[in-house]
Amino acid sequence: RQKLMVASYLGGCAIGNSFVGVVHPFSAGLSVVLKIHHCLANCITMTAMGQFYPQAAEEFLRMAKKQKVNIPRGVCGNLTQDQYGQLYRATIIHEKPLANALGKEFRNILTAEKTKEIFQAM
């Protein structure tokens, strides 16, 4: 158990200081607020990342289609304003990866309204 806890801690440190970009914060929001498993949340998030990673998003979607991976769509279509607020807060809290990907002024890019639009595209 002790080794597993140390490994988990080190993994968290690695993610927190890496260039995981915009995907992980949005995925974490889906996991925290909507209880979607992390791996699936990453896949769902990639469906709305074209504006940040056009080539990678296109390649990901092409590969998912080729492999017949069924990625749920519309998971954020009928949420309440409170849920969108929770998603925003659960996403924007990941300051390090967002700053790494978008710069120190990432909050000017990922406003609550912009974040809602991105989630609605999922």
Language-model segment annotations:
Residues 61-122:
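C-terminal charged capping/lid subdomain of soluble metabolic enzymes
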Residues 1-68:
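Active-site segments that bind and position negatively charged phosphate/pyrophosphate groups
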